[in-house]
Amino acid sequence: NDNPILPFQLIEKIHSETNLTLADVIYWKKKNSMPFQSSRTNLSRIVEPVYVFVNKQNLKSFKTNKEISKINEKTNQKFYKHYTNYIEAKNNDSIKTKLKATYSSELVTKLINIYFTKGSLIYDPFSGIGTTAVGCKISDCNYIGSEIKEEFYLQSIDLIKKVDKIKDI
C-alpha cells in the first residue's frame, strides 16, 4: 500500500509548480470497500477523494452547473441549490477488466452534471475502459481521451458503442 501522504504531496507540488490550485475536494462513497482486506495495518477504503483543480486566477470565478434556487430581491445575491461534497455511486460498471482503478459512469455523470454544461469538452488523460466517455455521452458532453494500453482502449470502444445503441433506442 502507498503512503497516505502521497496525494497531499502531489497536490502541494501541483499548486507550487503549476498554474493550477485545488478548488474543492469531493468524497465518493463506493457501494463496496476496496481493496479487500489484505493489509494488517490499513483499513479498507469505502470513501475515495476526488480532487477538483482550476487555474489559480479562476479559483473564485470558475463556472459550475449549480442551479440557482433563489435571488435576494434587495441585494441581488444568488443562492444555489444545496450540493454537498459527498457523492454516493457504485464502484464500477460491472465490467470485467484487468484495470484495477476503475470507477463508474454513474460517478462521472454526477460530477459532470455539477461542473459542466451540455456541450462541454472534457479530456480524460487516463481513459481506461471509458467510463468518463460514457458519462459524457449520457450528459451530452463532448469527450477526448487518451489510453496507452490497447486492451483498455478496445474495451472502452465496446462500452461506448453499447451506450450509443441505448441512446438510439
What are the residue ranges of the model-derived segments?
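S-adenosyl-L-methionine
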Residues: 157-169
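Core catalytic lobe of class I
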Residues: 1-154, 162
